[in-house]
Amino acid sequence: MAKYNFDEVIDRHGTDCLKYDFGMKRKGRDDLLPLWVADMDFRLPDEILDEFHKRIDHGIFGYTDPLDEYFAAMNHWFSTRYGYTIEPDWVTLGAGIVYALGTSVRAFTEEGDAMMVMQPVYYPFSEVIKNDGRRLVNCQLRYENNHYSIDFEKMERMILEEGVKALIFCNPHNPVG
């Protein structure tokens, strides 16, 4: 892969970019500095763009199935880090984390059920719970000595007191590690 220029500044204003073009619409201000996690401001490497162009030049955009290489890459990642492998039939692909989370919330809980998150956490987790008619229970992460951790005694107490039916556990925890 070629050397990548991380110093290149790309102005994304005027490209229908949620991160930059919708601050006024969503927050009523256009002077905010968006510090997003999953929306990078780096240009894709040419090697990746070339593969996109091959697919585009084919001209057909029907339904696809994940390639064997997808599962091989996933298993390499899991085996390298955790020493185990994933069977392809264990995996259900989704259109994104928020959509997949909403589908899971509706599949495994009922309206009115209590669901727990540990804030600070990726804000759509709480929105999905509330928007799907579930009751949000926040077990605030403990912050001590510049480090976040779970207070397991508090968490257990809240689960029992609030009748929590499901916990959304973000690992690694976004945004605090």
Across the structure, where does each feature detected by a protein language model lie?
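N-terminal small-domain helix-loop-helix segment of the aminotransferase-like
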Residues: 2-96, 103
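Conserved core of the PLP fold type I
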Residues: 61-177
